[in-house]
């Protein structure tokens, strides 16, 4: 699977992202880029989560997936990665937003 460059002028650029203040001029994506235009909710939190935080994240994420809501998170340790893992275990779709390139 090769990374895809999505420029702001491209029809593939996520529509909702166009309306934020200072949207990125380009995105690098890997995987199914169609889900970038589907409804999703960001689930983020502490890297040093508590057991309660983990339990609530799993419950919240599982419920969102049951309603076909995509999970968006940063892929960091803690709550972010718990959200992604829970989403995938429940057959959901997930988007990981990385602060740097795909090779890092």
Question: Where in this protein do the model-derived segments appear?
Answer:
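Phosphate/pyrophosphate-binding betaalpha-module
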Residues: 61, 68-72, 76, 80-104
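Short, positively charged patches
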Residues: 1-66
């Amino acid at each position: 699977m090769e990374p895809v460059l999505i420029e702001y002028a491209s029809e593939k650029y996520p529509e909702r992202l166009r309306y934020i203040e200072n949207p990125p001029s380009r995105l690098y994506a890997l995987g199914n880029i169609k889900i970038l235009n589907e409804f999703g909710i960001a689930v983020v939190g502490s890297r040093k989560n508590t057991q309660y935080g983990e339990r609530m994240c799993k419950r919240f994420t599982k419920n969102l997936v049951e309603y076909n809501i995509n999970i968006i998170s940063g892929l960091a340790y803690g709550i972010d990665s718990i959200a992604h893992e829970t989403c995938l275990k429940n057959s959901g779709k997930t988007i990981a937003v990385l602060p740097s390139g795909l090779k890092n």
